[in-house]
């Protein structure tokens, strides 16, 4: 039986990720200038997990109001801890527990981050998402979207070591594998192993089956009358709010 993915990631994820590797972690290469978020308006971090992207957003825009949206309670607890212990962002960062479809948001926001989230939204949910964002973004404000769509591998991705880190006497290892799961989904299995002095003392295994989406499908769903689409680089697209046409 698989363990809860969010609970396991809350325990192991940042231990394996921190400190940030500037050469490999996407946080170090967010294309802020080309995205051109509007920093004198509220900025949204959608599905921000434990808050590493929220900290990056707040650091890039040191005067902006930040809205951090994270429905999962375990990940949100890590997010809130990160915000709470930093007085320079605590007063201007609001942590919101609902999904992006249901959450309160202020009018006239200046942009949003959407990293590694879109493939967890079904087709009708994506339609509602774009409609919601059209209501809250000002003209010119972008949704900076990572080009990660949960693609189904053509063949089995064999289990392999995807990361390791140490803390005290423990070494933490993450093993990754994936395969097509049918009905447009991919099965992703992560196995976490804890070693003490070389001896295995704990394991956890998670299985998720996100939608596998082609970029062409995602982009075709974006309402062109409301947004323009800008290819920034191989990792990011800016979906930018356009002025409503007046008749």
Give the label of every model feature segment.
Residues 51-55:
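Glycine-rich SAM-binding Motif I of class I
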Residues 127-139:
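A short glycine-rich, Lys/Arg-flanked "PGG" loop and its adjoining helix->strand segment in the class I
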Residues 110-125:
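A short SAM/SAH-binding and catalytic strip from SAM-dependent methyltransferases
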Residues 1-49:
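Conserved class I S-adenosyl-L-methionine
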Residues 209-247:
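C-terminal lobe and adjacent flexible extensions of AdoMet/dcAdoMet transferase-like proteins
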Residues 146-213:
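SAM-dependent methyltransferase
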């Amino acid at each position: 039986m698989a363990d809860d993915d969010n609970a396991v990631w809350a325990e192991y994820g940042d231990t394996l990720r921190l400190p940030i590797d500037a050469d490999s972690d996407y946080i170090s290469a967010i294309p802020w200038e080309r995205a051109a978020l509007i920093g004198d308006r509220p900025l949204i971090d959608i599905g921000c997990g434990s808050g590493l992207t929220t900290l990056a957003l707040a650091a890039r825009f040191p005067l902006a109001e930040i809205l951090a949206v994270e429905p999962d309670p375990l990940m949100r607890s890590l997010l809130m801890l990160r915000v709470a212990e930093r007085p320079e962002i605590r007063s201007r960062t609001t942590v919101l527990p609902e999904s992006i479809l249901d959450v309160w948001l202020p009018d006239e926001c200046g942009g949003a981050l959407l990293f590694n989230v879109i493939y967890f939204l079904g087709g009708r949910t994506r339609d509602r998402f774009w409609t919601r964002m059209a209501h809250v973004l000002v003209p010119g404000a972008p949704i900076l979207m990572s080009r990660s769509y949960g693609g189904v591998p053509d063949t089995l991705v064999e289990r392999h070591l995807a990361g390791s880190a140490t803390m005290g006497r423990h070494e933490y290892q993450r093993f990754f594998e994936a395969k097509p799961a049918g009905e447009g989904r991919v099965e992703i299995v992560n196995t976490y192993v804890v070693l003490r002095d070389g001896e295995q003392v704990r394991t956890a295994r998670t299985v998720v089956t996100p939608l596998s989406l082609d970029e062409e499908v995602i982009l075709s769903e974006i309402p062109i009358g409301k947004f323009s689409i800008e290819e920034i680089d191989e990792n990011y697209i800016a979906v930018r709010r356009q002025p409503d046409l007046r008749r």
